[in-house]
Amino acid sequence: MKAISVPLKLINLQDDGFHLLMEVVVFKEKHLAVLDTGASRSVFDKSLIEQHLAETLKVSDEINAATLFTTTTTIQATIPLLKIGTLKIRDYETVAFDLQSVSDTYQQFGHPPIIGIIGGDILIQYSAVIDYKKLRLRLYKQK
């Protein structure tokens, strides 16, 4: 099984820890997302999803672990094509909520904005391996 190699960018958040960023393609546009091994599932910014999928959204109020156990309005949507490196994930079922404050924080520290968090659902499904020395994410597509 051949590995899909995705470059990572390591950023320092004011000596308070490091985050990994990666490029993703959503709605045929390149964006940056945070690679978060502690996130149970991948999420995308609500405004991005609303901009492209307004007519097909499902809205719900639920307790969401991704927002530190607070009640928030989440949006469920299907992204027609999510690309991570050469990996193409079609009809990706996602949850979206407001990531603007997260993106704003990155920008305040001189980093680019982010539109999503790539979490455990994708990382487990594609047997992800993070190589910190080479700053690469390897994903393995199941046959």
Residue map of PLM features:
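Pepsin/retropepsin-fold aspartyl endopeptidases
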Residues: M1-K143
